[in-house]
A protein has these predicted regions:
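Short beta-strand segments
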Residues: 31, 34-36, 43-44, 60, 90-92
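A short beta-strand-loop structural module common to alpha/beta enzyme folds
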Residues: 56-62
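Short Gly/aromatic-enriched secondary-structure transition segments
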Residues: 46-52
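Divalent-metal-activated hydrolytic enzyme cores
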Residues: 1-31, 64-71, 80-82, 97-139
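Short acidic/polar active-site loop segments enriched in Thr and Asp
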Residues: 85
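Short, charged/polar surface micro-motifs in flexible loops or helix N-caps
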Residues: 38-40
C-alpha cells in the first residue's frame, strides 16, 4: 500500500471518531516556538515543554534557522496577528542540518533530476543554512 493511501485511511478513521472541542486560532499560552522539523521531535517536544493542543504556534523548519523570509513571516503572524507574546527558538542535539554540505545537496538534487541551471539560481551554502554547533545555532 502506498503511504498516501495509508495516511488517507488513518485520516478517515480519525475524523470519524473525533469528538473535538472548539479552539481559538490564538495560542492560549501566547507562545510561538521555532524548532526543527526533525521527525524525532514529533510527539516529543510538546509534552517535554508541557505544551498542549492550542497552547502555542509551532513553526518548524530544517535546523530551526531563520534563513530567508518564511520563518520571519510565520513568527510575525504569530505575534502581530495571533497574539503570541514570547518566541522560543528550540534546537536539539544530533541535528541533521549541523555540518550540512551544500555540495552533497547539489549532487542529490542533480541525481533527482533538478537541472544544474535551476540549482545555480540559489546560493546553496546560505540557503541550506548549515551550522556546525547546535548550541551556537540557538544562542
Amino acid at each position: 500500500m502506498m503511504i498516501l493511501n495509508e495516511i488517507l485511511e488513518n485520516n478517515k478513521k480519525f475524523v470519524d471518531e473525533f469528538e473535538g472541542e472548539e479552539l481559538s486560532h490564538h495560542p492560549q499560552k501566547k507562545l510561538a516556538i521555532l524548532t526543527c522539523m526533525d521527525c524525532r521531535l514529533t510527539g516529543f517536544l510538546e509534552p517535554a515543554l508541557g505544551i498542549g493542543r492550542g497552547d502555542a504556534k509551532i513553526i518548524k523548519n530544517a535546523g530551526n534557522t531563520i534563513v530567508g523570509e518564511d520563518a520571519i513571516r510565520s513568527i510575525a503572524a504569530a505575534i502581530f496577528s495571533l497574539g503570541a507574546e514570547e518566541v522560543l527558538v528550540i534546537g536539539h542535539t544530533e541535528c541533521g542540518m549541523a555540518g550540512s554540505d551544500p555540495d552533497k545537496l547539489r549532487n542529490a538534487m542533480i541525481e533527482r533530476g533538478i537541472p544544474q541551471e535551476e540549482i545555480d539560481k540559489v546560493d546553496l551554502k546560505s540557503w541550506i543554512g548549515g551550522f556546525e554547533d547546535e548550541e551556537e545555532n540557538v544562542i
